[in-house]
């Protein structure tokens, strides 16, 4: 709320939000966390700011978290990311699935992608996260073209509503 209040007098062209990991580790209720994100995105978009959200990363990649807790946090991370996607898209923002794009790198080379505390990303991990959202951020600002218009849907394939596609 404090950061958002500072932006009200001079809304930025673009806001990039990385969110979710602390909500999982602090056991914040998903409805509360997503509701807060929804309000922030709504306010920013309403002020003319393009919003790109890097959704909750896969905390199942954090190796100091033992099994079976690692499986539980992986599932909670993915469920929160799906709910974040629905809320952000409904409010006019864009999302980037950090879990889908980065989890395999963090799992394959944890010593490279995690910092000394083995929880937070290293400089390389943060650089990969920034690179993951960059195309969407550039497109939101009109610096890159939007993805080409898709051909008409194949009637033999079902299109899913955003809530099902995000899951």
What is each residue range found by the language model?
Residues 2-149, 153, 159-167:
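Alpha-helical cap/lid subdomain in secreted, periplasmic
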């Amino acid at each position: 709320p404090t950061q958002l209040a500072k932006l009200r007098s001079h809304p930025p062209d673009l806001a990039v939000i990385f969110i979710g990991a602390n909500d999982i580790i602090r056991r914040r209720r998903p409805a509360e966390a997503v509701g807060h994100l929804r309000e922030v995105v709504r306010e920013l978009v309403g002020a003319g700011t393009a919003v790109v959200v890097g959704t909750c990363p896969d905390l199942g990649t954090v190796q100091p978290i033992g099994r079976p807790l690692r499986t539980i946090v992986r599932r909670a991370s993915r469920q929160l990311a799906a709910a974040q996607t629905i809320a952000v898209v409904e409010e006019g923002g864009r999302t980037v699935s950090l879990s889908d794009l980065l989890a395999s790198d963090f799992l394959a080379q944890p010593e490279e992608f995690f910092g000394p505390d083995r929880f937070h990303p290293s400089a390389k991990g943060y650089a990969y996260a920034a690179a993951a959202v960059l195309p969407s951020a550039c497109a939101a600002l009109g610096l890159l073209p939007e993805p080409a218009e898709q051909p008409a849907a194949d009637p033999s394939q079902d299109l899913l509503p955003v809530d099902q596609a995000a899951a």
